[in-house]
Each structure stands twice: as structure tokens, then as C-alpha cells.
Amino acid sequence: MADTLMSDTPFWQRKTLDEMTDAEWESLCDGCGQCCLHKLMDEDTDEIYFTNVACRQLNIKTCQCRHYERRFEFEPDCIKLTRENLPDFEWLPMTCAYRLLAEGKPLPTWHPLQTGSKAAMHGERISVRHIAVKESEVRDWQDHILNKPSWAE
């Protein structure tokens, strides 16, 4: 009975982030694209400013990287979120599964692991699909700074 109960419980509810396989870890990403928006840092204060400017490799419509497996070849500054460096990324959105699980919180009901698709996430406007602009179309990056979210203060 206990084995059946364990298998019915989703992996993210029965494993810590450290216990997850690489495939499970990767599947936590909801594909919102928020990590793929450029951030600007104030040289004097190290304060991070969020923009709506998408990385060149982000397909804005699908919110997927065009070259995910080889992304560092195309974008050397692309982040690689790992179990070890997760605490360094304080700017991750409140909706990020990695952040939520690290804080002991549940996945949101719209998360693709809960629903089986990204439709609910896009419907909730969690993804950057509705706000992102192509890097090639930006003249002055400062014009694209978003209001800093309250959680990042």
C-alpha cells in the first residue's frame, strides 16, 4: 500500500531538489521565459533591473530557447540554474518552480507538470509571450526596464 501511495505522489512532492534526477530537475522549468529576459545591473549599487528584452535565442511565441542544448555556444552569458547555484539567483520570479520548491511551497495549479501543457501558464500571463520584445528591435535598453517587482526589493 505504501509503495502504491508513493508512486501516486508526484516526484516534486516526495523528493527534495537534491534527490531529483536531471530529467526531473529539467521538467520543473515551466518554460515561462522569464529567465531569458535581459537584466541590467547598476554598476554602483549592483541593483538588478528587469527588462522585457528577450535573448536572441528565445522564441517569443513558444517561450522556448531555439538552441537549448547548445545555448552556451550561442549565448555564453546564458544562466545555468543548478542545485548548487540556486540560492545565487535571488531574482527568480515568485512563480518559479525551483524557487517555490526550495522555499517548501507547492507548485501552482497552472504549472505544466500539473496541467500537462503550457496553455494554463500562458493563460495566466505568467510567460513572457505577452511582454517580450526582440533584442534586435531595441534601441535604448533603458526604455525597456520594467517596474521592479515588489518581491525583488
Swiss-Prot record:
Signal peptide range in chain numbering: none
Family: Belongs to the UPF0260 family.
InterPro entries: Puta_zinc/iron-chelating_dom, UCP006173
Pfam families hit by this protein: CxxCxxCC
Top-level taxonomy: Bacteria, Pseudomonadati, Pseudomonadota, Gammaproteobacteria, Enterobacterales
HAMAP family registered for this protein in UniProt: UPF0260
Gene name for this UniProt entry: ycgN
Name listed for the protein in its UniProt record: UPF0260 protein YcgN
Source species of the chain: Salmonella typhi
